[in-house]
UniProtKB/Swiss-Prot annotation:
Keywords: Cytoplasm, Nucleus. The keyword Nucleus applies. GO terms for biological process: proteasome assembly. GO terms for cellular component: cytoplasm; cytosol; nucleus. It comes from Schizosaccharomyces pombe (strain 972 / ATCC 24843). One of its GO terms (molecular function) is protein folding chaperone. It is found in: Cytoplasm; Nucleus. This is Uncharacterized protein C16E9.19. Gene3D superfamilies: 3.30.230.90. InterPro entries: Proteasome_assmbl_chp_3, Psm_Assembly_Chaperone. Its main location: cytoplasm. It comes from the Eukaryota.
């Protein structure tokens, strides 16, 4: 069985960020990159499986707990860029879980693998803007 593949790109501060998603039955692999390389890789797992309809609230308190595990890269423990990558991975997991619950609440939330190679900086504001761009790209290629 071949995966369903979608791709898109977006310009961010003069750099083209490319995104591709590949869906294999119950797993989604997403790559977001400026170079075609993967610098960091994260796996999102869900602590509770969602097997019955769930009411979504604005604060997303009904979402299952999401564990983010670093598979590749990640840098040092105090590296601000690594922290932003991990936060972004968690946000991607939350976005996909929420969308899955809205569309098909009776179906188990898929596993998500996220590869990132994006221009993180030491500036929290710029990293926040970059995270928004990444979430927009993910939303475009996964829904």
């Amino acid at each position: 069985m071949f995966p369903k593949i979608k791709q898109t790109s977006k310009n961010y501060n003069g750099k083209e960020i490319q995104a591709i998603s590949m869906r294999f039955s119950n797993q989604i692999t997403i790559l977001v990159t400026i170079s075609g390389k993967i610098g960091q890789m994260y796996m999102m797992t869900y602590e509770k499986s969602v097997m019955s309809p769930v009411s979504i609230t604005g604060d997303m308190s009904t979402l299952p707990e999401i564990g983010v595990r670093t598979l590749l890269g990640g840098g040092g423990e105090d590296d601000i860029k690594s922290h932003w990558a991990q936060i972004t991975a968690g946000q991607v997991g939350s976005l996909l879980a929420r969308q899955q619950m809205l569309v098909r609440p009776d179906v188990r939330i898929p596993r998500v693998c996220l590869g990132l190679h994006v221009p993180w900086t030491d500036d929290n504001e710029k990293n926040g803007d970059l995270t928004v761009v990444i979430l927009e790209l993910v939303k475009e290629i996964c829904f």
